[in-house]
Amino acid sequence: MSESHIDFRKAEFLISAPDIAHLNEYLPGDVGVEIAFAGRSNAGKSSALNLLTEQKIARTSKTPGRTQLINVFRLDKHRRLVDLPGYGFAQVPLALKLKWQESLGEYLLKRDCLSGVVVLMDIRHPLKDLDMQMIEWAVESHIPVLALLTKADKLGQSARMKMVNEVRKKLSHFEDGVKVEPFSSLKGIGKGKVLGILDSWCKPEWLMQQLEADAIAAQAEADKD
């Protein structure tokens, strides 16, 4: 069964959850498909979500570390985008920082519906310890990863591609492979490529088979009338 491209402009806010336990209460971890966005508090996560959905769906703040909740946005009845709390901001109290990191790890390891993870990093300061931890958690769980090098407009094209190649080389040891792409919310750099990757993650084989079966059943019911 073929399906047209997912329209990310249809994303709408669904719920916020303070932690993985509450998220599992609201949305069981084995229902539908989720794509998670994770990154340091100043990586431009909210701006990226706003560009990709072409709306101000995620709240941006001049104060890094302000997003403390897991925010879920619905694309359709089967698919969701998840904005995870930013990590690594120095001014956040240590206890809260550790709670966030524990929650992020638990989310990546225990959400069976997770179809892919976008790890956003400032292209000028990529692959910090927590970035690597997020990537390793996802790879260990056999979840596809896109390392998105944000604020790519801050570098010239030559320096930009040099950094992209360096990051690809540093991540090449992961057997399942980690995609690496430059991105700029300001200039729209990489938007098309990212949407293509997200679109493919939204269409796992099991879901496409389910949708095909549902369509056949619906047609059979219609034919009875």
From Swiss-Prot:
Coiled coil: none
Keywords: Cell cycle, Cell division, GTP-binding, Magnesium, Metal-binding, Nucleotide-binding, Septation
GO biological process, alphabetically ordered: division septum assembly
Cystine pairings recorded for this chain: none
Pfam families the record matches: MMR_HSR1
GO molecular function annotations of the record: GTP binding; metal ion binding
Binding site for GTP: 39-46, 65-69, 83-86, 150-153, 183-185
Alphabetized InterPro entries for the sequence: G_ENGB_dom, GTP-bd, GTP-bd_ribosome_bio_YsxC, P-loop_NTPase
Cofactor: Mg(2+)
Chain ranges of the EngB-type G domain: 31-204
GO CC annotation: cytosol
Binding site for Mg(2+): S46, T67
Role this protein plays: Necessary for normal cell division and for the maintenance of normal septation.
Identification of the protein by name: Probable GTP-binding protein EngB
Organism expressing this protein natively: Shewanella pealeana (strain ATCC 700345 / ANG-SQ1)
Lineage: Bacteria, Pseudomonadati, Pseudomonadota, Gammaproteobacteria, Alteromonadales
